[in-house]
UniProtKB/Swiss-Prot annotation:
SMART domains: DSRM (SM00358), RIBOc (SM00535). It catalyses: Endonucleolytic cleavage to 5'-phosphomonoester. The lineage of its organism: Bacteria, Pseudomonadati, Pseudomonadota, Alphaproteobacteria, Hyphomicrobiales. This is Ribonuclease 3. Residues 160-229 form the DRBM domain.
Length: 235
């Protein structure tokens, strides 16, 4: 699409009319289409960084309100599911971003408009663009519009991270993970537990929770996240 492309249809899908459309244009600009110096500044990469954090904040608030009985470990797993690359790429497709991407000739010919990693990055960049143009409330409305259905009906069942970690260790010929208590703090009526999980030859991971079980799950999640392992089934 040319730079004079009328973005009215896209803005209608997003539910936001830009006061400064340059934010939207930048969010759709891949590094391959930028020439000269400071290419990373004039592509969506900085917006992607901001959008990742804005998206995480809004989705965290949504989860906190939607699941009042959920403990922090479950909320963290749900958050990871909702902001993972595949989910963001699906949102980008729902937004209809592909045809609007500004790509270099090589990327355009290689099918980049359908590439999951690029679509996921652009979805986050668009969140940031709306945030910069209309503030947190506008960004929240955008996230609500495209992520709410995924929050209420998760596409993938969530798995216990302790089970996933044990399977991961077994597949690598390692013994079962060992969980050890590190610290107990707080009053008796609201204790906090810090737990570490150990596997031979690997750095331990620590996490806190309101119970030992919650802390163990959080520690397992932290370990898996560090190793790049996803805890949802179907991977």
């Amino acid at each position: 699409m040319s730079e004079t492309q009328d973005f009215a249809a896209l803005e209608a899908r997003l539910g936001h009319s830009f006061a400064d459309r340059s934010h939207l244009v930048l969010a759709l600009t891949h590094i391959s289409s930028v020439k000269g110096q400071a290419v990373r500044v004039r592509s969506y990469q900085r917006l992607e960084f901001l959008g990742d954090h804005v998206l995480g904040s809004v989705v965290s608030h949504m989860l906190y309100a939607a699941f009042p009985k959920a403990e922090e470990g479950e909320l963290s797993r749900r958050l990871a599911e909702l902001v993972r690359e595949e989910a963001c790429a699906e949102v980008a497709q729902d937004m209809g971003l592909g045809p609007y991407l500004r790509l270099g000739p090589g990327e355009a010919q290689s099918g980049a408009r359908q590439r999951r990693a690029i679509l996921a990055d652009v979805a986050e960049a668009v969140v940031a663009a709306v945030y910069l143009d209309g503030g947190y409330e506008a960004a929240s409305a955008l996230v609500e519009r495209f992520w709410r259905g995924r929050l209420e009906a998760p596409r993938r069942p969530l798995r216990d991270p302790k089970t996933v970690l044990q399977e991961w260790a077994q597949a690598r010929g390692l013994p079962p993970p060992v969980y050890r208590d590190v610290e107990r703090s707080g009053p008796d009526h609201a204790p906090r537990f810090r737990v570490a999980v150990d596997l031979p030859g690997l750095e331990c991971a620590e996490a806190e929770g309101g119970s030992k079980q919650t802390a163990q799950k959080a520690a397992a999640s932290a370990f898996l996240a560090r190793e790049g392992v996803v805890t949802e089934s179907g991977e």
